[in-house]
């Protein structure tokens, strides 16, 4: 794994990054291919959409299972001339011993799935931009995937 900054992501940032990574792994890579999927991931960059590909865009929100609403920080997140999708992942926080989704395991699984070193480099750089570097503390944040909805 890679190491770096000592600043840790907070729980909301962890949950948000997990949602973006699930979307990358389960949808974007399968639809667009690895390199294009990674290049379209703009979540760590100062843009209004988390993923954008030609005429498609996707804004990813991840919420705890007990919440009934999402926070949209600006109208630009959903405003566009092109029709896009708001994708909402609903996750339930579990104990660290639960066999669920943790940030470190998700990152490692995605990284290991890439064949090209250049794709691995892009992925690692984007993770660094969002503030993620491997830390065992992230293993304490384990989630059960409940559902994903598209709007």
Q: Which residues does each PLM region occupy?
A:
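Nucleic-acid endonuclease domains
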Residues: 1-46, 63-151
């Amino acid at each position: 794994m890679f190491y770096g900054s000592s600043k840790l992501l907070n729980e909301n940032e962890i949950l948000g990054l997990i949602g973006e990574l699930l979307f990358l792994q389960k949808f974007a890579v399968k639809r667009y291919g690895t390199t294009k999927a990674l290049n379209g991931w703009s979540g760590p960059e100062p843009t209004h959409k988390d993923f954008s590909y030609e005429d498609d865009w996707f804004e990813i929100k991840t919420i705890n299972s007990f919440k009934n609403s999402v926070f949209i920080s600006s109208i630009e997140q959903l405003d566009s001339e092109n029709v896009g999708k708001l994708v909402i992942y609903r996750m339930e926080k579990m104990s660290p011993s639960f066999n669920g989704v943790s940030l470190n395991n998700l990152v490692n699984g995605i990284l290991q799935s890439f064949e090209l070193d250049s794709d691995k480099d892009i992925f690692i750089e984007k993770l660094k931009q969002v503030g993620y570097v491997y830390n065992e503390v992230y293993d304490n944040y384990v989630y059960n995937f409940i559902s994903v909805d598209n709007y």
